[in-house]
Every structure is written in C-alpha cells, then in structure tokens.
Amino acid sequence: MTRMRVHELAKELNMDNKDLIDRILKLGIQVKNHMSTLTDSAVLKIRQQFSEAKTETVEEKRIGRAVIRRRKKLTEGESAAAPAEGEERVASEALPVEAEMPAQPVEAPELIAEPISKLPPEVGVAQPQLPEEPEPAPEPLIPAVKPEEAAASELAVEPQTVVPPVAAPAAEVKPARPPMEAPAPARKPPEEKETKVKHAEPESLAEPLPSPAPVELTLVPAESAAGQVAERTDEEEEEDDKARPKKAKKRRRKKVRKDEPARIIKLPEIIPEEPEEEAVLPAHLATRIQVKTEEVEVKEAPRKKRPRPEEFEKEAAERKAKGTRRKEVFEREDLYSKQEIAAQDDRGRLKGDKRRPFAKEPARPEIAVVKPGKRKIRVDEAITVANLAKQMGIKATELIKKLLLLGLPANINQAVDFDTAALLASEFEFEVEKTGFEEEELLQVREDRVEDLIRRPPVITVMGHVDHGKTSLLDAIRDTNVIGGEAGGITQHIGAYYVMLPNGNVVFLDTPGHEAFTSMRARGAKVTDIVILVVAADDGVMQQTIEAINHAKAAEVPIIVAINKVDKPNANIDRVKRELAEHGLIPEEWGGNVTMVGISAKKRTGIEELLEMVLLQAELLELKANPAKPARGRVIEAKLDKGRGPVATILIQEGTLRTGDVYLCGVNSGRVRNMFSDRGQRLDEAGPSMPVEVLGLSGVPNAGDDFITLPDERQAKMIAEHRLVKLREKELSRTSKVTLESLFEQIQEGEIKELNLILKADVHGSLEAITDSLLKLSTPEVKVSLIHFGTGAVIETDVMLASASNAIVIGFNVRSETKVQELADQENVDVRYYDVIYQLLSDVKDAMVGMLEPVFKENVIGRAEVRQTFQVPKIGMIAGSFVLEGRVERNAKCRVLRDHVVTYDGKISSLRRFKDDAKEVKAGFECGIGVENFNDIKVGDILEVYELQEMKPVLESPPGDK
C-alpha cells in the first residue's frame, strides 16, 4: 500500500493543511510540511483520533408546549460549544415566527431524531465535498464547521426533510455575529418553495401555506437542523450566500446525472433512491425541505471565508454570472471580458502563467484616440517637433519619419515653421490654426475725430543718385554744411531735419544715394509725404535714380524733380526730362503731372521756387494729424552711443511723445528718458511730423520699426518678450532647416574657401547696408560669412571671437580702445577701420582675391635640338644641342619632345658651353644640356624650355550679376 501524504489526508478530511499538521504534531507524529508522507499506522491513528473526536450525543429539551429543542453535543466540548449556542439562539428567534401554528404534528420530528442519533460518524468522512445542504440559504452569515460534521449532518437530513423552512433559516444564523441575524426571519421561504419545488405534488405545495399544522414539526427539526448547520464549513455557508433560484435549479440537474450518494439531502434526487423514507413523511413537509434545499444549494470550491454584507447581494447578483468569483469586484470591464477576468488568479495573472494578461492592454492605441472635435491644433509662427507631437497626441518619432519622407531631416527639438507644421498635420488628418499673440487687440488704433485733427508739416524725402547734390540741396535749404561732416563727401546715414520756413515748417529726410543703401531709400519712401528726386543736369538719369523712382511709385508718393547743377556748362535739361519721361515721369509742360524745377545747390538758385512747389503740393494733400492721442512713429535710424547708450531717431507720425512715456519699439520696451531735436536741443515733448532722438531704449532697434507708446509698462514688456520669442523661433527654424539637397550642397562646398568677417558699425542703417553689400560679394570660389555684426565700438569679445574663428574685424565709423588694439596684436587678429563704404567693399574684394589659388601662365622661352649625346660619369647623359630660338636657362623647366610627343617634362640640371658652366645660352649657339633624372635622350629630340609666370587671380562675378 502506498504511503499517504499529509495534504492528501487533509483533503480527505476536508481540513486545512496547517490545522492537520498541528493535530498530527499533537499526536506525536513528526512531519515537516504538507508534502511529508505518513505511514499506514500513522494514518490509521489519525483517522481513529478524528473518529473519536466526532462522537455525538443528542440532548432533547422541551422549551414549551409546542417546542422541543434538540442539541447535538460532540465529545470534544469546544467543537460542540458553538453549535449549541447557535441552536439556543435559533430556537429563541424561531419562536415568534412559528408561534401562530398549532402544535399537532409534534410526533413527526421524533421520527427525525432517531436517524440523527443512529448515524455513524464515519459516514461524514466518506463524502467530504457534498455540495448540497438541507438547510436554507437565505442567511449569508453561517459559522464554520468541520467538513466531517457537515457531511454527517447532510446524511441525517433525510428524515429531517419534513422540517418547515421557516425555522431552518433561523437555524443557519451564525451565532458569532448576532447583528446579522435579524434579516433571517424577514424572508419568506414558503414563496420560494412554491417557485422551486419540483418533486412535490401540486396539492402538497398548496397545503403547507394555509395550514398551520406544521408549526410544531418545524420547530423540532429546526433544533436538529441547527446542530447540523453548525457542523457545516464556512466555505459551504459562504457559497450559500451565492445561491440564486436560477443557479439552484441548474446545478440540481447536473448533480442528478452524477448520482453522488453524498447529495441525498436533495429531495429531488433522494425521492427515487430511498422511497421508504419519503413515504413516512407528509407531503407538505417534503415540500418545505425542498425549499430549504434550494436555498442551501450552489456549492463550489471554497473561497474567502468572510461573508458579503447583505446590502451588496443585489448588486453582486447583477454583476456576476453564475459560478464567477468574488474577485470580479475589481471592475475592469472596460478593457477585459469577464471570461478573461475569471481566468485570472488573485494577482490578476493567468492561472498557471506568471505573465500578466493585461500587460499590453492599457497601451491600446484606440484608448487614446483623439476626439473629432479636438483634431485642431494651434501653431504660432514656429513650433518644435516635440510640442507638435504633444498637441497631436502622437509619437514624435512618427513626425520625424514623416519629415524624412518629405526631405526635411529634423530632430525632436528642432523648430518647424507654420507651413511645415500644417503639412505635417494634414498627413495625420489634423487642422492647423495659426495663433499668435493678439497684439492687434492690445495695440488698437483709436479712430480720430475730425475736430481733433490739425495740420501737420509735410515730410519730404530727398532721393537721387550718388553725388548728384542731395545733401548740398538740404544744406542750401537749412543754411548749413552737413556734407562737410560726411566722410568722403557722400551721405552714408539717413538724416532727419526740421526746417522752419516763412510759409510753413517742413521735415526733410536725406537718404544715401550709394547703391549699398537701397533699404534706407525704401524706408525713407515709406514714411514720407513727398519725394524730391534730385537729378544732375550733366549726368542725367543714373542707376540709383531709377531705383528711387521705383521706391516712390511703390509707396504711392508724389514726386517733384529737382534738376541740379544747371549752372554747369555741359548741363542738358532737355535730355534729363526726356530720360525721366522714359521712366514714366512726364513734365507738366509736356502735358504730364510731374513738377520739374531747375536749381543750383551751390549757387543757391531756384531753391525758393522748389520750396513753393513743395508747400503747394502739401496743401493739396491736406496733411493732418491728432496730437492729443498716444504717440506713434517710425525708427529712421538707430545707433549705440558709448556715452548715451542706444539712441534712435524717431519720426513722430501721430500723437505727442513726452519724456517718461512708456514705449514699445520692436523687441525693445521701456520709458523715454530724454529727447533731442536734430540740432541737439533737449525737448520735453514732440508733436506729429517731428524727428527726435530718443534715449532710454533697452536695445538698439532696427531701422523701420514702429515706435508706439502704451499706458502700461508691464503690457509693453510682455509684448516685447513675445516678439523676441517669435523672432528666435523664426530664426531657429530658418537656420536649422536642412534638406537632403542642401546637405549634399554643403558637402560639395567643403572645398569652397570662406572669408569670416565681424562687422561693427555706428548706426543700424549703415550696418544693414554694409551687411547686404558684403553678402553680395560671395562667389563660387570664395564665400563671405558674417559670423557677427552689430552697432557700437569694437570690443574685446569681438577680438576673441575673431581669434577663435579666424575672422577679420571691420569697424565702420567706429573705433576701439587701446587695450582692444593690444589684444588684437597679441592674438594676431586683423582689425580694420573704414569711414567710406566703397573703400570697405574694395578691401574685402582684395582679401577674397588673396584667398584664391594662384594662377600660372606658361611662357616658352627657347627651343634646342639634340644633335649628339655624351655619357659623362657621375652626371649621366648629356645632350649636345643647338639652340634654335630664344634662349636656354639653367634650372628652367624643360620638355623633351620626340616626334612632337612629350616624352618627359622636367628641369634642366646642367648647362655648359664648351667646358664652362653657363647661366644661359642664346639662339645660334651650341651647348651641352643635362636633364634632371632623365637619361633616355636621343639624337633628334627637341628640348622645349619654358617658364611659369604667376598671374593675379580674378574673382568671378557673383551669381545673378551681369
């Protein structure tokens, strides 16, 4: 006989492994764990001990005339104590429920008592897993009892099936928890009986309900039933809580097919097997037992011992399917089916599998699907790939892949502009809404009332070709000598002047005529009311004259032509008018609408007539402005002054600017600290059409920026910071955008030489003009690169940057301190200063030429014919030659021609005439010539002697130039 293990014996006895091990150790049998084996004698001893422990005695006690209490006592007092207390409590609670019924059939329970006392205890051990109980299941709170005792009570129920259902629920109440006993009597077993009993006849079903006869019979079995119920295990009682009418019916059908003898307590199965027992009992009693059987039914593998409160039963019944476990209280129906949950263990894992079945479920993409109403993203001027991916709710790697497919390599932190973001969003079916800082709402322009408008001086811009007399004309009008202060005699700044005339005040803007100052001229045309186009009578229409005409037409500004230098002998006014007519400026005397006046700025003739025409044109325009509103203007010029800091020349267009006003200018904001007129006079306020120099700027603004005054300094600072962020994002997206094509071009450009420059200028306008001109100098061979530029003097950081990047520092109209020059000498940095722009551009061109590879030109200086060869020891082959033409020089380049084919190209190593070394031999003489590292000279070869002349390289024209 094979040995039995502890866990097998525990299963047979329906005990927990630990409890059984404790009992075994008390018997003196040594075991280690539940896998330990037991000898046959040990098993027999254990079984005998349990059999003796289960010996029962039944006590009967008459409580009243119609009530008899039977108490089943175990030999072990402690195991029988709990059921006894339960019985007493059950009996006392059952009395009020059954008190109305007569006590006639008291004898019937006596028939039940005999089978209970006669049952051997071994029978309960033989069937440890009986799923059915005769006791009713309405109460969830049942005390735990040993499996053997439960089995014994199940077999004893057969005669007790006559017990009415009213007392049985009370008998099942767990004595350890009296507060939960109250709901038991409230239930109505007779109603359940009528719906669930199958084996009882219809008349027997109807009899027990109206008849009070079963009252006493019900109480007697209730006592015995209480004793039996106390022996049931907690697991069985907890399963009783789960019992439902539907489930009870289905499970009973299954159990009938199995014919398990331990389940004879179910009257529907017991009736055909033991008819003699049922014949003794009245039909109405049998019917009531079926009701209790239905309530006690549905027993499965034992689960948690803690019962569910009654108030949760209804909710649990709706949520659970049959046979499901209590673990379903963890609601995961959103992600998993109930079958998946039922297949999981207590830790949420598949049974027999350590992997979590739902580990990958929470990452389902459909859970994070963006709603249709939210498929719109907001993008400013630029946005990083990471922020765009976050708004779209997709991975940034997906956007990077899409950018690669579009030919735009990018990383997660790279900024893309609005158009690229819109293209990306459309690929993922998103809409893009361009949003920005709503400056328009904060900077709303108030409409002027007619009564608030007053006349303002006209703004006149003087334009024309370089050296045609623009500044000389202004000097004549202002009675000053501005041109004397300009380097090189040409205007390199845009100047603003307020001139008071007898017939009215006028504001003049003097723009440069040099080709480098195109942006200045365009800026002047945008802020002006009238343009005076100066044309030299001796030169006629030139390149910048045509450009000025186009700027004025683009700004839709009326033009008055001043034909200067009419006092010169070679002046030709008619030719000038004819050339202007070719460009759309028809003189009034020719039927056009353009006023043309001949003047001489040096002799100051025609000036008054010109001013009259200007004021007449201004009256026709009816120029008005409101001085009572916040000031708005335009930056004409800006610079960084060493003593005063950033200084900007502002032309007030409307409103009045006062000292202390809060301003916003581009990305700068602050308060106006001081104001000065064009003549250097301090001003407290400036009205419309008045140019002023403003101090107190937080930085050097760009020429052409709007100058606006605001009531709140915090608001101005917020707008300025927002503009700065937008500017940085825009520059970042422009500089960091690298396409596959541009990447290939950069690889090819590795051989292109690059001239690095650091540019510092006095004013922003000059800086802008020089920057544009320098960038236009780039050629396919040499590229001009401005690694840094700004306004102000050359400082130490500029020198250090130039040293690190191998750059040249250029200062325009600025100088540096002595220590800066010493640092430049120490670092071997070339620092150059200029006052005239064309000198600067010329030197930069020369520097670019110096970076080109030298060009050599080949000049043939002589030819000699080999007529005889000589072998000289330690020297080699010597060619006795006759100089046919030119001359032969020692160390000159030489080619050996044989049959007009170059055999060797080398150098003449020795040259002799007779026995003397010669420096050169001219034509018509014979000489001996030795060719370096070449001895295969033959008679008839021609020696061609040449020299390489180094030529100055020439820069190719920049792309686009003609």
UniProtKB/Swiss-Prot annotation:
Q: Name one Pfam family in it.
A: GTP_EFTU
The protein's UniProt keywords, in alphabetical order, are: Cytoplasm, GTP-binding, Initiation factor, Nucleotide-binding, Protein biosynthesis
Q: Where is the composition biased (Low complexity)?
A: 156-173
- According to the record, the residues making up region (G3) are 510-513
InterPro entries assigned: EF-G-like_DII, EFTu-like_2, IF2_II, IF2_N, P-loop_NTPase, Small_GTP-bd, T_Tr_GTP-bd_dom, TF_IF2_bacterial-like
Q: Where is this region: G4?
A: 564-567
PROSITE patterns xref list: G_TR_2 (PS51722), IF2 (PS01176)
Q: Which cysteines are joined by disulfide bonds?
A: none
Task: Specify where the region named Disordered lies, as residue ranges.
Answer: 122-263, 293-327, 341-362
Q: Which residues form the tr-type G domain?
A: 455-624
A GO term from the CC aspect = cytosol
GO terms for molecular function, please? Answer: GTP binding; GTPase activity; translation initiation factor activity
Instruction: Mark out the compositionally biased spans (Basic and acidic residues).
Output: 188-202, 308-327, 344-362
Region annotation (G5) maps to 600-602
Q: Write out the similarity annotation.
A: Belongs to the TRAFAC class translation factor GTPase superfamily. Classic translation factor GTPase family. IF-2 subfamily.
* Record function comment: One of the essential components for the initiation of protein synthesis. Protects formylmethionyl-tRNA from spontaneous hydrolysis and promotes its binding to the 30S ribosomal subunits. Also involved in the hydrolysis of GTP during the formation of the 70S ribosomal complex.
Its name, as the record gives it, is Translation initiation factor IF-2
State the organism's lineage.
Bacteria, Pseudomonadati, Thermodesulfobacteriota, Syntrophobacteria, Syntrophobacterales
